[in-house]
Structure formats: C-alpha cells, structure tokens
Amino acid sequence: MKQSSININVQLDEDKVPEEIRWSASDSGSNAPNKAKAMMLAFWDGADKSALRIDLWTKQMMMDEMADFFYQTLMTMADTYKRSTQNEEMTNDMKKFAKDFYNKFRAQQLKENKI
C-alpha cells in the first residue's frame, strides 16, 4: 500500500501568533514547501462523533483575503458534500449561503469605503 504525507510548519512570534505557514505534500511534485497565509484543517473523530479543527492565519492575512478564503472554502465544502452524498438540494443551499456571505461582506466593505 502506498503512503502519502502532508507536513505543516508554523513559525510563531513571541506571543505564539503565526507569522508564517508552510506546507508540503509527498505527492505534490514540488520540492520546496508552499507558503500560505491561512489554513483550516479538520478531522472527523468517528468514536466521539465530533470534528477536530485547527484554524490558523498569519498576521499578514488581510480581512478581504479572509473573506475570499471563507467563500472559497465554503464553496469547496459544498462540492465535497455533493460528491459524498449526491444531495443536490443541500449543496445548492450551502452554495447560496456562501454567495450571500460574500456579497454581504463586499457590501459592508463598499459602505465603509474599504474597497
């Protein structure tokens, strides 16, 4: 059986706030670690029936980038849900929520003249 690995390295400041996130994967084809400004990692514990999560972002992550990150993450979560359940109606609801979330964020930014 083939084994793959994903490695995540987080550089913290003196207050334990992430300054840099780098990741690499054995099957990525890249020799150098990839930089990221944010990450969300979730595991399902079947015994406890609960999600275990690690959410990190660097000091450099801007608010508009965070909104983009959440929008894209919500959309891809909806795609994953559809692939695993074939439930088109729930997938559409999730995608509608993601779009509404993003549109509301953009409207707030326009109102505050931040974009």
PLM regions: where:
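Intrinsically disordered, low-complexity linkers and terminal tails enriched in Pro/Gly
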Residues: 1, 28-33, 110-115
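Structured beta-strand/loop patches that form or line metal/cofactor-binding pockets in enzymes
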Residues: 1-9
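Active-site- and interface-proximal helix/loop "cap" or "latch" segments in soluble metabolic
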Residues: 19-86, 90
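C-terminal charged interaction modules
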Residues: 79-115
